Regions:
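N-terminal, positively charged/glycine-rich alpha-helical extensions of SAM-dependent methyltransferases
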Residues: 1-30
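Class I SAM-dependent methyltransferase Rossmann-like catalytic core
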Residues: 22-48, 52-53
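Class I SAM-dependent methyltransferase SAM/SAH-binding core
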Residues: 65, 71-73, 78-123
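A conserved beta-strand element that flanks and buttresses the S-adenosyl-L-methionine
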Residues: 135
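A short, conserved alpha-helix within the catalytic core of class I
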Residues: 143-154
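Conserved beta-strand signature within the Rossmann-like core of class I S-adenosyl-L-methionine
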Residues: 160-168
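C-terminal alpha-helical "lid/dimerization" subdomain adjacent to the S-adenosyl-L-methionine
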Residues: 168-212
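Conserved Class I S-adenosyl-L-methionine
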Residues: 205-235, 247, 251
């Protein structure tokens, strides 16, 4: 059957309900994290962070915020990477679902440098949060265009070093392959439905370029990556050098 992916879908996902809770949600969060690991999603976001901090002094603390953090798997990956490479990361997970935040906290008890906040990204509390780097992994597609512009405007204003976005390519091939993954990983009904809707709410490269131009972003890079992802890195031009100097002064 022909699948039209010309335009983004407006269909909502079950997980868009921030009051959702229970074992079904917990299972979905953990399966999403596992699939993201196996398909290289965590590695893709980590590579983006590595690119952004390449010229930063490694002796200083870097605050990284993960928007739509899910079960916190990405932040634990970052924390492990930081420990292995003698980097000081302070990681903050953001999610609007309190059950999700509690689950992430339980899974991150052994990480003293990871904290979580149940916050609406369109609230004043989030708009006042400052950080060096902000991550948005498999989260941006949940928003409409005007919300995306508003959200990235906040990201750009409040981040000192840059932004790493990792999200889905909208394509019929990705849709069909995910149907196969549903069978292989025995995903529950919610995960199957939401996963397929997520792909239809994903992006074409020209749409991300359009957002970049509309936001008047000076330095950005958009690359297609396996498995049917786009890595969108926004660097704060001029700010990297000032951050480096401030860090050196602190030392």
């Amino acid at each position: 059957m022909f699948l039209d992916t010309k335009y983004r879908s407006n269909e909502s996902e079950i997980m868009d309900d921030f009051a959702l809770e229970g074992e079904i949600l917990k299972e979905a969060l953990d399966k999403i994290a596992k699939i993201n690991q196996l398909l290289g999603g965590n590695h893709l976001t980590l590579k983006g962070v590595q690119e952004l901090i390449h010229n930063c002094p490694v002796t200083n603390e870097i605050t990284i915020v993960d928007v739509g953090c899910g079960n916190g798997d990405m932040l634990r990956t970052l924390a492990d990477y930081g420990i292995k490479n003698n980097l000081s990361f302070r990681c903050i997970g953001i999610d609007a679902n309190n059950f999700t935040i509690n689950h992430a906290q339980n899974l991150s008890k052994n990480y003293s440098n990871i904290s979580y906040r149940c916050v609406d990204v369109f609230s004043k509390a989030f708009e006042e949060l400052k950080y060096d780097i902000v991550l948005c992994t498999l989260t941006l597609h949940h928003f409409k265009e005007d919300e995306i512009i508003r959200l990235i405007t906040v990201f750009n204003a409040n981040s000192k070093i840059g932004i790493v976005i990792n999200d889905l390519q909208r394509s019929a091939v990705a849709y069909r392959l995910f149907q196969v993954l549903c069978f292989v990983f025995r995903l529950n009904t919610m995960s199957r439905k939401d996963g397929l809707v997520s792909i239809l709410r994903g992006f074409k490269k020209n749409e991300l370029v359009h957002f970049s131009k509309k936001l008047n972003v000076a330095q950005y890079k958009i690359q297609w990556k396996w498995a049917f992802r786009y890595q969108w890195i926004i660097k704060k031009v001029g700010d990297l050098e000032s951050v480096r100097r401030k860090m050196e002064v602190k030392n």
